[in-house]
UniProtKB/Swiss-Prot annotation:
This is Large ribosomal subunit protein eL34. It comes from the Eukaryota. Pfam families: Ribosomal_L34e (PF01199). Residues 113-139 are annotated as: Disordered. One of its GO terms (cellular component) is ribonucleoprotein complex. GO terms for molecular function: structural constituent of ribosome. It comes from Ochlerotatus triseriatus (Eastern treehole mosquito).
Length: 139
């Protein structure tokens, strides 16, 4: 005759978070072992590729993990993969170079470089000179 198994938790439905398997204990009894969800590796924020050098874990485990298991020592380590980071650095460099070239061309032509106009703030003395309004009730 097969041994009957009793649930260790109250939830009896076979949901994603309530998976069970039957295990034989050293004493010869059969009991339910609750299986945890599979751990995942974080993905790159841009290309959605798995990030290498980072330990797979559940989101609830990550706060208890030390930093070296969660990131790699690089700019945007643990957020972007190396290819996307390289692309981003090169793009930023080229944009900066374009700005420098624009300034140099303007200097060669003898034109001053146009800068966005600054917004002047109203003087504080003019604001203080205005009389304060008094609230009067009229019946």
């Amino acid at each position: 005759m097969v041994q009957r198994l009793t649930l260790r938790r109250r939830l009896s439905y076979n949901t994603k978070s309530n998976k069970r398997r039957v295990v034989r204990t050293p004493g010869g009894r059969l009991v339910y072992l609750y299986v945890k969800k599979q751990r995942t590796v974080p993905k790159c924020g841009q290309c959605k590729e798995k990030l290498s050098g980072i330990k797979p874990s559940r989101p609830s485990e990550r706060p208890r993990m030390c930093r070296r298991l969660k990131t790699v020592t690089r700019t945007f380590g643990g957020v972007l993969c190396h290819r996307c980071l390289r692309e981003r650095i090169i793009r930023a460099f080229l944009i900066d170079e374009q700005k420098v070239v624009k300034v140099l061309k303007a200097q060669q032509l003898g034109k001053p470089v146009s800068k966005p106009p600054k917004i002047a703030k109203a003087p504080a003395a003019a604001a203080a000179a205005k009389p304060a309004k008094t609230a009067t009730k009229s019946k």
